[in-house]
UniProtKB/Swiss-Prot annotation:
It is found in: Cytoplasm; Golgi apparatus membrane. Belongs to the COG5 family. Component of the conserved oligomeric Golgi (COG) complex which consists of eight different proteins cog1-cog8. Acts as essential component of the peripheral membrane COG complex that is involved in intra-Golgi protein trafficking. COG is located at the cis-Golgi, and regulates tethering of retrograde intra-Golgi vesicles and possibly a number of other membrane trafficking events. InterPro entries: Cog5, COG5_helical, COG5_N. GO terms for cellular component: cytosol; Golgi apparatus; Golgi membrane; Golgi transport complex. It comes from Schizosaccharomyces pombe (strain 972 / ATCC 24843). It is a peripheral membrane protein. Keywords: Cytoplasm, Golgi apparatus, Membrane, Protein transport, Transport. GO terms for biological process: intra-Golgi vesicle-mediated transport; intracellular protein transport. This is Conserved oligomeric Golgi complex subunit 5.
Length: 411
């Protein structure tokens, strides 16, 4: 007689060892009430159980080979390998105990049922240990070799995905942590995780003064994705610092427009022909907004980089929308560009009101040609986004509203 025990569903959450045991008994007609049939069934069941034992042995040999290969490819330390081999020997002993439990039942399913349950539990542990070491085999090479910044961030992104996968695996099967080899690898993972977080955060903060960026660079996207996976709070801190720094720099740049040299101010106030002073003032205004446009371009780059990061799927379409939805994050539902120009506009409005009281002669220069003011501001905002914008663009409306004090006053 030939019986084939079905191991195909050992990974499924609805695996039913009792049903498997019943299937064995039914296959040998052990449910008959006739004594003669019971004797025949016992003999048939004996053959069936021997076949199950043979299949158990085959599984052990196959999984031991697979697991050892995984470990050999991922670990160089001989002590690790010896430890794994010791664990495999222990598993073999467990299987021997299971085999000894597989006895021919006379009246009930108890011994066979218990044996199959133990078989399932042990085999699950063996299988997921193999999966865990397979993850480690992919993880270790990502920290080796000298590479450039973008390639390193790409590797850190892959490593973060694997660390997440490892965490999920251990949360589903926490008993694996009792294996000393797993504990050693977890300590190494903690070290690598800290390294990734530290270096990725340093990269993000280094972008604070980076005004040249490649259109094809995924470094910023990968860095944000990595911190989203490993430390969301630190990612929020870093982005808050970056945006606050850019806003402060833009405010300082705008304030510098109205810081006139003594010569220019003397020409503006005392000269019968203030054209020279006016020319200098307009030049400072144009240059100031050009510098602001470069800062705005950086915000646009960050915004688009976050839009490309879809690591937060399916909860959010991309990281930009994730941050927009966070109740305690500075964006408060706005895009990065809108937030940048809104904060800048608040400072501009305050500055304009102060100058209107203290330096009306300086503002008279801009009031004389408000159309030129509008053109310079709109072009600066357009330049920051590399898109054609008009007076209906929200960013333009926000900024121009803060400059309304420069508009000619109706008589």
């Amino acid at each position: 007689m030939e019986f084939r025990y079905d191991f195909s569903d050992y990974k499924k959450s609805d695996f039913d060892p009792k049903a498997q045991a019943e299937r064995v008994l039914i296959s040998v007609h052990a449910d008959s009430d006739v004594n003669e049939d019971k004797e025949v069934a016992r003999k048939r069941l004996g053959y069936a159980l021997k076949e199950v034992e043979r299949q158990i042995t085959d599984l052990i040999v196959h999984e031991e080979t697979t697991l050892t290969k995984n470990v050999s490819s991922s670990l160089n330390a001989q002590s690790y390998l010896q430890d794994i081999e010791g664990k495999l020997e222990q598993l073999m002993l467990v299987y021997e105990r299971i085999r000894s439990l597989v006895v021919i039942p006379s009246e009930n399913l108890g011994p066979l049922h218990e044996a199959i349950v133990n078989l399932h539990s042990t085999y699950m542990t063996l299988y997921w240990l193999g999966e865990f070491f397979g993850i480690q085999a992919k993880l270790f090479p990502l920290f080796q070799g000298s590479i450039n910044e973008n390639e390193k961030l790409s590797r850190y992104y892959q490593a973060s995905l694997l660390l997440q996968e490892s965490d999920q695996l251990l949360s589903r099967f926490p008993l694996m942590k009792r294996q000393s080899s797993v504990s050693l690898l977890l300590k190494l993972n903690i070290t690598n995780r800290s390294r990734i977080i530290k270096e990725t955060s340093s990269y993000l903060l280094s972008q604070e003064d980076q005004l040249s960026f490649s259109v094809n660079s995924n470094g910023f996207t990968n860095a944000c994705s990595v911190l989203y996976m490993l430390d969301k709070y630190l990612l929020e801190q870093d982005l808050t610092r970056l945006l606050s720094s850019r806003i402060q720099k833009a405010i300082i740049q705008f304030d510098s427009i109205f810081q006139l040299s003594p010569t220019t101010r003397r020409l503006l106030h005392n000269s019968t022909d203030p054209s020279a002073a006016n020319s200098t003032i307009w030049s400072k205004f144009e240059d100031g907004w050009y510098q602001i446009s470069k800062i705005g371009a950086q915000c646009v780059f960050w915004e688009r980089s976050l839009q490309k990061a879809n690591i937060c799927n399916p909860d959010y379409p991309n990281l930009l929308e994730y941050f927009q939805m966070q109740p305690n994050f500075i964006l408060d539902g706005a895009t990065i560009c809108i937030y940048f120009f809104k904060e800048l506009a608040i400072s501009i409005s305050s500055k304009m009101q102060m100058l209107d009281r203290r330096d009306p002669i300086l503002l008279r220069v801009f009031r004389s040609d408000f159309q030129r003011v509008t053109h310079i501001v709109e072009q600066a905002i357009a330049r920051s986004s590399s898109e054609i914008v008009n007076k209906d663009t929200r960013e333009c409306s926000i900024v121009m509203n803060s400059l309304r004090v420069l508009a000619p006053k109706n008589p």
